């Protein structure tokens, strides 16, 4: 990973559900470690559970909610 790329650390506070054509993506609500008042919904590929720390390359984009 390039050291010049700014990253944001976020903690998974709730697993919302599975999405994707085969369920290979998990929708989670994350809380930023620098600003704990800010939470967003993101899609995560691979295994994830509550309490995990994610490294977000881009922290402004939010996932659409599951139906």
Curated annotation (Swiss-Prot):
One GO CC term on file: cytosolic small ribosomal subunit
Which UniProt key words apply to this protein? Ribonucleoprotein, Ribosomal protein
Coiled-coil region(s): none
Q: List the disulfide bonds.
A: none
- Tell me a Gene Ontology molecular-function term this record carries: structural constituent of ribosome
Query: Which InterPro entries does this chain map to?
Result: NA-bd_OB-fold, Ribosomal_eS28, Ribosomal_eS28_CS
Q: Which GO terms describe its biological process?
A: maturation of SSU-rRNA; ribosomal small subunit assembly; translation
Is Ribosomal protein tagged as a keyword? yes
Q: Which superkingdom does the taxonomy of this entry point to? A: Eukaryota
What HAMAP family would the database entry show?
A: Ribosomal_eS28
* Family recorded in the similarity comment: Belongs to the eukaryotic ribosomal protein eS28 family.
Name of the protein this chain belongs to: Small ribosomal subunit protein eS28
- Per the record, the gene is RPS28
């Amino acid at each position: 990973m390039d050291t010049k790329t700014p990253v944001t650390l976020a903690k998974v506070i709730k697993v919302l559900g599975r999405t994707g054509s085969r369920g290979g993506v998990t929708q989670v609500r994350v809380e930023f470690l620098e600003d704990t008042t800010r939470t967003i919904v993101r899609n995560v590929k691979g295994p994830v559970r509550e309490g995990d720390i994610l490294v977000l390359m881009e922290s402004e984009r939010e996932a659409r909610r599951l139906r």
